[in-house]
């Protein structure tokens, strides 16, 4: 290789000065890798490193791009870091540079409609993300003074949830259940229902199969939900380190929406909904990272700070008061249980952190009751504060009635004869159960939920055969949309007075029921 002459070096220096290259010397703390394996590197010489500082493994022969890591263990004579990316090219003796900053991800308008990895890098083939706005993934949660009580509903479009376990903007509501009980389906339906509601959605996939993530992205595209959604994917094939930071990266993107807003359909939006799917796999990834870092294991081999792992994440969900912009970040964490055991370590941790839980049960799912909601142990600690006046008035008794119906139905299996009151209660419960059934990807508007619940609770469906409830629902909704659109608008705008229900709703249901009986040719005796 030819050696550059003094003249050539001088010319290069002049050219650099003309082009404005910064020739000022920079002081960089440099360390050396003394041990590496399984995505963890021990580094000597970085005595000045901060906790959670971003470290750079610079390019070398065989690696054109730098690899980054996060310093997690600060020991007496070394630093242990998890490596974000391909660690196979890192060897003993490699140089490591301190960056003096914590890991940040791109945020803001440019991410809407994109699929990114845990570092905020695009993985959807739509080109680079054009943004100059970055946020650190870790941040202290908003303080008490900056918050406002939760009082605005997040309409999930799922009648069983909106009526009995209402979710408010700024709430943390856990979705918990065994595998294959419809947890992700509830979250995806909620995202689909936010179309036109002024909400940005963030879906964080942690440790899932790539095929499953691709299927979810296709569903969001099909229903037009990707236009206001960000997907953050750290799949099962990626390192435990990336799965560990993925929810924090998604949360940083949501906080940008909450605090500074983005434009959706020509208007500013400051409300965000984030789904963590799921935090069981997140805890497993953190356990793997901690064991590789030689941290002492505790219960079920999880490290001692596994509670703080999730509490510092979920506490960042908030409703800000008007002085701080009035935005909100609503969190829907998902936890997978084993054999319906909600008293295991991670489930109890997350239940105690969140503001309620939606418990989905395998037996109900297999019985065809979908969503498979167990009313008895599902709860929202925000309650009626996050409901409109009309929904609150029809759903006050619903949860108690449904819980009592489940108990009576279980008792009735062993009883030979039942008194008339108990039989009537069971029959009404069966009809309400049919009302609460809902197919996937078919969110129900608020006004339709209120009307059908009012009909069910007040006995208008008592004479309708159970197998005709679905048909009656569809025809009632069509009738209300065509004959009484003003009632639906009043419910949606929350303009009904305290004398709910309005006479129009009663007369509409009675007229529809009369027509339905004539068309269907059934009587109370046939029911």
From Swiss-Prot:
Molecular functions per Gene Ontology: ADP binding; ATP binding; proton-transporting ATP synthase activity, rotational mechanism
Catalysis: reaction(s): ATP + H2O + 4 H(+)(in) = ADP + phosphate + 5 H(+)(out)
Pfam families: ATP-synt_ab (PF00006), ATP-synt_ab_C (PF00306), ATP-synt_ab_N (PF02874)
Keywords: ATP synthesis, ATP-binding, Cell membrane, CF(1), Hydrogen ion transport, Ion transport, Membrane, Nucleotide-binding, Translocase, Transport
EC number: 7.1.2.2
Coiled coil residues, start to end: none
Subcellular location: Cell membrane
Gene Ontology CC terms, in alphabetical order: plasma membrane; proton-transporting ATP synthase complex
Site (Required for activity): 378
Residues involved in ATP binding: 177-184
Top-tier EC class: translocase
Record's bilayer topology term: Peripheral membrane protein
NCBIfam families registered for this protein in UniProt: atpA (TIGR00962), PRK13343.1 (NF009884)
Function: Produces ATP from ADP in the presence of a proton gradient across the membrane. The alpha chain is a regulatory subunit.
Family note: Belongs to the ATPase alpha/beta chains family.
SUBUNIT field: F-type ATPases have 2 components, CF(1) - the catalytic core - and CF(0) - the membrane proton channel. CF(1) has five subunits: alpha(3), beta(3), gamma(1), delta(1), epsilon(1). CF(0) has four main subunits: a(1), b(1), b'(1) and c(9-12).
Record's protein name: ATP synthase subunit alpha
């Amino acid at each position: 290789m030819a050696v550059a002459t003094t003249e050539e070096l001088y010319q290069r220096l002049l050219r650099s000065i003309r082009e404005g290259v910064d020739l000022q010397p920079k002081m960089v703390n440099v360390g050396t890798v003394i041990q590496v394996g399984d995505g963890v590197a021990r580094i000597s010489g970085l005595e000045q490193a901060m906790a959670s500082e971003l470290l750079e493994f610079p390019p070398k022969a065989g690696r054109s791009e730098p690899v980054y890591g996060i310093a997690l263990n600060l020991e007496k004579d070394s630093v242990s870091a998890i490596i974000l990316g391909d660690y196979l090219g890192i060897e003993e003796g490699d140089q490591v540079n301190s960056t003096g900053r914590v890991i940040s991800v791109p945020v803001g308008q440019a991410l809407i409609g994109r699929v990114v990895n845990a570092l905020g890098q695009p993985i959807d083939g739509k080109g680079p993300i054009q943004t100059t706005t970055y946020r650190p993934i870790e941040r202290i949660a908003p303080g008490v003074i900056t918050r406002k009580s939760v009082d605005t509903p997040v309409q999930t479009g799922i009648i069983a949830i909106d009526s009995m376990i209402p979710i408010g903007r700024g709430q943390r509501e856990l979705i918990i259940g065994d595998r294959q009980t419809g947890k992700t389906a509830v979250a995806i339906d909620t995202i689909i229902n936010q179309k036109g509601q002024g909400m940005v959605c963030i879906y964080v996939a942690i440790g899932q199969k790539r095929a499953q993530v691709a299927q979810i992205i296709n569903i969001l595209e099909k229903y037009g939900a990707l236009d206001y959604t960000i997907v953050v994917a750290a799949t099962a094939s990626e390192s435990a380190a990336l799965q560990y930071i993925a929810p924090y990266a998604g949360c940083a993107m949501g906080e940008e929406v909450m605090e500074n807003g983005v434009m959706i359909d020509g208007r500013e939006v400051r409300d965000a909904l984030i789904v963590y799917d799921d935090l069981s796999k997140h805890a497993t990834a953190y356990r793997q990272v901690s064991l590789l870092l030689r941290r002492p294991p505790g219960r079920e081999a999880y490290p001692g700070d596994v509670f703080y792992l999730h509490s510092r994440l979920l506490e960042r969900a908030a409703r800000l008061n008007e002085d701080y912009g009035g935005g909100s970040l609503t969190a829907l964490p998902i936890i997978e249980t084993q054999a319906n055991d909600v008293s295991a370590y991670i489930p109890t941790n997350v239940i105690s952190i969140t503001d309620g839980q939606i418990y989905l049960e395998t037996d109900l799912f297999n019985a065809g009751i979908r969503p498979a909601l167990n009313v008895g142990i599902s709860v929202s600690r925000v309650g009626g504060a996050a409901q409109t006046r009309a929904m609150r008035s029809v759903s006050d008794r619903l949860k108690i009635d449904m819980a009592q119906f489940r108990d009576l139905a279980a008792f009735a299996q062993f009883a030979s004869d039942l008194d008339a009151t108990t039989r009537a209660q069971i029959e009404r419960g069966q009809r309400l159960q049919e009302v609460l059934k809902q197919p996937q990807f078919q969110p129900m508007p608020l006004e339709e939920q209120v009307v059908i619940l009012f009909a069910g609770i007040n006995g208008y469906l008592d004479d309708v055969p159970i197998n005709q409830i679905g048909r009656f629902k569809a025809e009632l909704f069509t009738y209300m949309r065509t004959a009484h659109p003003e009632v639906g608008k009043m419910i949606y705008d929350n303009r009904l007075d305290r004398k709910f229900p309005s006479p129009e709703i009663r007369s509409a249901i009675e007229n529809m029921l009369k027509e339905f009986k004539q068309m269907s040719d059934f009587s109370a005796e046939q029911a």
